[in-house]
């Protein structure tokens, strides 16, 4: 409901008056306990926070609070430092205490919103950001927070506008420039993205050399992309149907890159950008065009060098995709070797249907003038299309968010866990994954099994990985019982995802469905298969393979 302008003015004056009164009361009560030296000490803490020395800032703020627990500015500073350290529970506690002390603190509400957004609670974060803006319409952290919600929920244009406004209010906060770089890159505004990242490097702390090296390599790659043609330009058929293998529950298709011979690629919705193996890159003559830093990942040493390449084209069935950026890295697969992974960005303009029962992949070109009916789009004919129609099935459409890293995240429910959880929907993962943090909760202890498993990750092989058995795993209105899951540290994923992921929905769950991906609208449709099309549940479980970050 929109209030009349005169009522809004009265409301804002009342809020400002209450805020002024609250500030006077706080100052009057704390004057004796807040000497001038405390202000100098807080400035030192703020300087440490800006310099990226979060531990030093935390210590200073804790010392100040030990002297005066009613020091609101120090409590807000401590919450902010803990947020930067990704100690989300502690950060939440101090932001909540600040609100209890001063309910009219816009900064406290903005901080609380930022913390709960990082945990993946979108509904509460929106409430807190809006409360902050009702108290102070120019609260930059709240403006940036709402902009990032737009980013995750695929309203990227609105995100860019919000971040630009936040930067105009607080041009010294490096995170806003970093986020703007991400949003601009998603909109294919590569020059603006590179400029934003370069500004971030100017004002950001120099404490994390690997992150700076990653960004310098990414900026070089963005500059390179800005000189190329339209990325992911589509040609060929409007609709293409092709078979896939699924020996380990991952859809493995045959593609051609740069017009060459057929190669084996995994269809990987757990990767934003496509990936090419080092060996295949050498064979087909694809060279690095930029590189820099190391990416954190599962397995081995926990990281791998970031190397960027560029493909003139990829042919998937009768669909032709031109100008495709890729990562180039070493692959560790032993039992089911592949040449690459086809990521979300390459498929972004295609409605992609993965039928695990028929082992058939259907690609339909997205028509910008329509909102596709995902229940029938699989049978929409293309020109000269003689393929047999597919049986219509009931299903449920699940809204997706897109993480900062570019992969799909949806809400799932696990019996015994009281809150909804954010899971990555990943066709490139053999098995479902439960994060170590979630597995450590008291209510999850009954899930843990005695057995161990071997996991192949982007950074190598992890041995003796804990296993869990999820009693009931639900997505939308559909539930599967007794789903095996690997228990893995997902912090490498969460450091770059923007909001917390509690697990990965892998092939051992998705194989029970026909799955339709509408990447542009951020929707996944799940259609349960008939029992006759479900793979044998008593078959040997394959080696687990996790997403290629």
Description of each model-found segment:
Residues 33-39, 43, 55-59, 63, ...:
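Pepsin/retropepsin-fold aspartyl endopeptidases
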Residues 14-28:
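Bacterial N-terminal signal peptides
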Residues 66:
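Rossmann-like dinucleotide/flavin-binding elements
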Residues 1-13:
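N-terminal secretory signal peptides that target proteins for export/translocation
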Residues 49:
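Polysaccharide-binding and catalytic clefts of secreted carbohydrate-active enzymes
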């Amino acid at each position: 409901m929109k209030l009349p302008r005169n009522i809004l003015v009265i409301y804002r004056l009342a809020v400002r008056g209450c805020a002024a009164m609250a500030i006077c009361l706080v100052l009057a009560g704390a004057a004796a306990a807040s000497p001038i030296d405390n202000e100098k000490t807080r400035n030192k803490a703020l300087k440490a926070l800006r310099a990226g020395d979060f531990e030093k800032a935390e210590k200073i703020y804790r010392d100040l609070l030990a002297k005066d627990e009613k020091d609101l500015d120090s409590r807000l500073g401590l919450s902010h430092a803990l947020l930067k350290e990704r100690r989300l529970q502690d950060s939440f506690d101090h932001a909540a205490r600040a609100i209890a002390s001063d309910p009219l603190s816009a900064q406290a509400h903005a901080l609380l919103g930022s913390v709960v957004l990082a945990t993946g609670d979108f509904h509460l974060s929106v409430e807190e950001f809006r409360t902050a803006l009702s108290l102070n319409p120019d609260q930059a952290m709240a403006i940036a927070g709402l902009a990032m919600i737009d980013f995750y929920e695929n309203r990227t244009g609105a995100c860019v506008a919000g971040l630009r406004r936040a930067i105009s209010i607080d041009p010294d906060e490096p995170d806003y420039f970093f986020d703007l770089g991400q949003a601009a890159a998603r909109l294919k505004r590569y020059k603006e993205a590179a400029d934003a990242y370069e500004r971030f490097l100017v004002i950001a702390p120099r404490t994390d050399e690997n992150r700076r090296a990653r960004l310098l390599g990414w900026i070089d790659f963005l500059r390179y992309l800005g000189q190329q043609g339209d990325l992911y330009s589509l040609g060929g058929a409007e609709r293409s149907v092709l078979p896939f293998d699924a020996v380990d529950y991952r859809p493995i298709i045959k593609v051609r890159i740069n017009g060459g011979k057929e190669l084996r690629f995994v269809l990987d919705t757990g990767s934003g950008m496509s990936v090419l193996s080092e060996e295949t890159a050498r064979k087909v003559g694809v060279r690095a065009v930029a590189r820099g830093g190391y990416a954190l990942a599962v397995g081995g040493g926990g990281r791998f060098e970031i190397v960027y390449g560029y493909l003139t084209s990829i042919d998937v069935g009768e669909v032709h995709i031109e100008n495709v950026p890729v990562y180039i890295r070493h692959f560790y697969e032993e039992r089911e070797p592949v040449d690459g992974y086809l990521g979300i960005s390459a498929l972004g303009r295609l409605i992609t249907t993965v039928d695990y029962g028929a082992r058939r992949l259907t690609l339909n070109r997205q028509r910008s003038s329509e909102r596709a009916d995902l229940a029938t789009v699989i049978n929409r004919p293309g020109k000269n299309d003689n393929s047999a129609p597919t049986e219509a099935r009931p299903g449920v459409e699940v809204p997706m968010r897109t993480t900062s890293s570019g992969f799909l995240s949806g809400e799932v429910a696990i019996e015994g866990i009281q809150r909804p959880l954010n899971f990555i929907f990943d066709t490139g993962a053999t098995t479902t994954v439960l994060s170590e943090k979630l597995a450590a909760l008291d209510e999850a202890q009954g899930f843990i099994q005695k057995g161990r498993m071997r996991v192949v990750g982007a950074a190598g092989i992890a041995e003796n990985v804990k296993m869990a058995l999820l009693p009931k795993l639900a997505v939308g209105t559909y539930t599967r019982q007794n789903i095996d899951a690997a228990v893995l540290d997902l912090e490498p994923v969460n450091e770059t995802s923007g909001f917390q992921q509690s697990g990965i929905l892998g092939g051992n769950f998705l194989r029970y469905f026909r799955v339709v991906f509408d990447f542009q609208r951020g929707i996944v449709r799940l259609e349960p298969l008939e029992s006759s099309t479900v793979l044998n549940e008593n078959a040997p479980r394959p080696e687990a393979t996790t997403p290629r970050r």
